[in-house]
Amino acid sequence: MIDQLREFKRDYYCGDLNESNIGDEVRLLGWVDTVRDHGGVIFINLRDREGIVQVVFDPSKIGEELYNKAKKLKSEYVIGVRGRVYRRPAGTENPKMKTGNIEVAGEELLILNTSKALPFPIEDNIKVSEEVRLKYRYLDLRRPSMQRNIILRHEVYQAVREFLAGNGFIEVETPMLTKSTPEGARDFLVPSRLEKGKFYALPQSPQLFKQILMVAGLERYFQIAKCFRDEDLRADRQPEFTQIDLEMSFVTEDDVMTLAESLIQYVYKKVLGIDIKIPFRRMSYEEAINKYGTDKPDLRYGLELIDITDLAKEVEFKVFNDVAKSGGLVKGINIKGGSKFSRKEIDELTEYAKKFGAKGMAWVKLENGEATSPILKFFTEEQKQKLFSLMDAKDGDLLIFIADKKDITHKVLGFLRKHIAEKMNLIDNSKLEFLWVVDFPLFEWDEEENRLVAIHHPFTSPKDEDIDRLDEALNSPEIALSFKSKAYDMVLNGEEIGGGSIRIHTPYIQEKVFQLLNISEEEAKEKFGFLIEALSYGAPPHGGLAFGLDRILALMTGSESIRDVIAFPKTQKGICPLTGAPDYVSEKQLKEVGIKVEVDEE
């Protein structure tokens, strides 16, 4: 069969043929998509990665041997066809196909391979479990939508490299076998055979190495980097994922953000033909949380959070009053047109709120000139009017409220806001709302560990005005919690697609931050000693950013999960149904690396 290909060379991809090819003799290679027999005339749709074209075997125009060969064809047979391109007869055109005005009259047929019966059809919108799709990923990837996703991924790679190389960046690969460090998700560990008892870690990001490349004087680095995190998975997470990673010397936050905006603008124009306006809007972390309940707000719709805590201190409704007077937060959302929600739908919203930590949800419905609610009996007439004024309430609105600790109130209303927007079809999926979230806190308090933790990572620089207060903060976590960082996150339609910061570039400040994070001098030296040492040899000011490539691709393609833009993803349990990974290994292999495995019977 392979010998046949020596004389049979493809002229065109199926999807590239058009009316300019009418009259041409062409050679095509691909897979049989469908076979139809209409009155003895055999029609096949031949498919390759660029599309589909109709091939006709008409017994009145070809020999018996060729016709009988064509009759044997079934779905997913691999074939070569030589024939001439014709315009389809009037009335038989297919406007749904890119090649729907033409067909190829088959004159030669090579059957290069046959196929078993398929576990699912090779078409879009199939109703089959993701588990089955991933088990037969080689078939799933034949589907046109999946091929488009993988090709688009390649085009994004190319555009990223073009832009960054054109802006003075050098592509450098950093190690995949590195050292386990604290302050992050769990590491994937790799045992060393030569240094028994010791382990490499797969990198969660190239963070330390890219900073060291700045110390090395390369000034502008980038890498399309594989990263690994052993964490619980969800729709937008994978144990291994890809970042567009970059770092720059002698830069400010504005420099990095401007470069990142231009990169996104270039990629969207080059790959999708979409014009993105820059600069992007900027919003402080505090404003994002206060208005939208999240540090990655979706700005395609309103439903902003409204603070009624001061009013809640005055009313006799105990739930509001107790929370407001104990330092909590009472906030609401005005759902315009929400009065049409039934009591059952309001109860469903309450149950949804409870999933995220709410104890309940108060509501007020304004309908036909009346306000109805179980809580209004606790409000005076003046307090009711003040509430309606604060909430900008009009007839036809539904007001919902959460009263709890500050972080819970924001979190719950943030999720409710998104849920309501989806339920009421308020989201314009054609819009691209880019946003920078800036002025993040440098630290947050971990209640479980009873210590400060870094919001981003421990190498993020504090704002200049906070650097002089580092010593003071060592004895006062409250002071440290007021520090702002030189960090920035890029958000698109409510998804964080990238983030970075200006880094700490002096050993003194880095050591102070480690102290605030309760990382001892010994631990810092053991885990990060090579970085602190490097910073002491004239490290330039530097900063950078990493984009989540898989997430950007999911947004570009409208995919519900990043698994649809990765060729060979894992399931939500971290399993590869195609290969069966992870799997047990032999006792011999374990012995070579000095490991004994104890498996929990449960």
From Swiss-Prot:
The record marks 38, 91 as: Important for tRNA non-discrimination. GO terms for cellular component: cytoplasm. ATP binds at residues 229-231, 238, 496, 548-551. It is found in: Cytoplasm. NCBIfam families: aspS_bact, PRK00476.1. Aspartyl-tRNA synthetase with relaxed tRNA specificity since it is able to aspartylate not only its cognate tRNA(Asp) but also tRNA(Asn). Reaction proceeds in two steps: L-aspartate is first activated by ATP to form Asp-AMP and then transferred to the acceptor end of tRNA(Asp/Asn). This is Aspartate--tRNA(Asp/Asn) ligase.
